[in-house]
Amino acid sequence: MSRPHGYSKATMDRISREYNQVAKKINTGRTNRLQDQTIIFNLSESFANPNRVPGVSLKANPIPKIDHIKKETTSGIMISSGYGGGTADMEYMTLTGFAMCNFAQTLSTPYTQLVPYLKHNPTIVQSFKYATAIHPYSKKFYDRGTDYPKFGFKSFFYLGSKKHPIKHQQKIDRNTYLSDQTAYANTLDQLKSHHGAQFINLVTMQNHLPYNNLYNGINRYRATVGDGTDPAQVENYAMGIHYTDTAVTQFIKEIDKLNRPITLVFYGDHLPGIYRNSMKKDGLKLHETDYFIYSNTAAQRQGAKKLTRSTHYVGPNDFIAMAAEQTNSRVTPYQAMLTQLYHQLPAYALSTQQNGTNSFNSAPEYINQQGKVVSYSSLTKQQKKLWHDYQLVQYDITAGHHYLLKTNMMK
């Protein structure tokens, strides 16, 4: 990452003092603590409604239940920094709040190129006394087995683990990956076995590529597609997210039965790479995934409320601030900065004119609440200052002298 202009100990001390004050102001109106909540970040592999893709239409809607949930709670479009890949990058951004578009072009996968080599990796995990990761697949991909302990996770449930095995293993028809129902059953086990507050990072696998001859009955989602796109792949994919639709809805019913505050942040990491649209023409649409943030009945009794501002278009970096705001939880100075970024800046991502599948990064692209790309030059002076402060913080923690670790900025 390039050294931002003005980087120095004095500058970072100024940033720490300033966002301490921002945090104090925000926390005046907050009554809860994150560490008393159970927050689940659920990365849903390749989840995005095909009906948003130009030239694609399906005979039926594969995700009616999730669409209904989205109408009832905080929800919108997440701008992904990948197409057809880049899962670990979206996961990294949600957990740290840092942006891929701030890194050097050659740093395309922080999980393998950065995290293992840093002594300190501040994440949302450190706001909790207990944290668990669940991934119904191998721990080897993207060095998760190395990175999760560095992030502060106490346990990691994965396929092949003897200490923390994946149970309730089910597959659907000819899909070789474990189902989303499997993922949620293991998450429910964790919620029931650890009775206190906790953070859970759940990464599913069911809808991972390939999308050939996976399911029976795909005719119910018969697809009309553009030139070059294989309708059978779209139909198989649609059937997969139909099963996700059912599994998520059932999981929400189960967490509503638990008498403690639980908030689920559900998001698709990227679209499946099955659409042969022009990236130059349709790039933004090919980087739009679905997200929602659902707080169970117990959380609502404690003051959790649907967010109504800045929710239409967000980035993975926004979920820490959004989860804290929805649960009315107090924030650290760094989380206060993320809160300002969420409310005051457009969503930001790598260029949506490229695939962005763990290859090379690009300059930031900004997308406003109307879903339009806006230029950096259109930002106000205050917005540019906030963006520069953010770059300084990311540089200090990941490539600089770690001045902020000697302050309470990240605590």
Predicted region positions:
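Membrane-interface segments at or immediately adjacent to transmembrane helices
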Residues: 1-41
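Solvent-exposed soluble domains appended to multi-pass membrane proteins
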Residues: 24-30, 44, 49-411
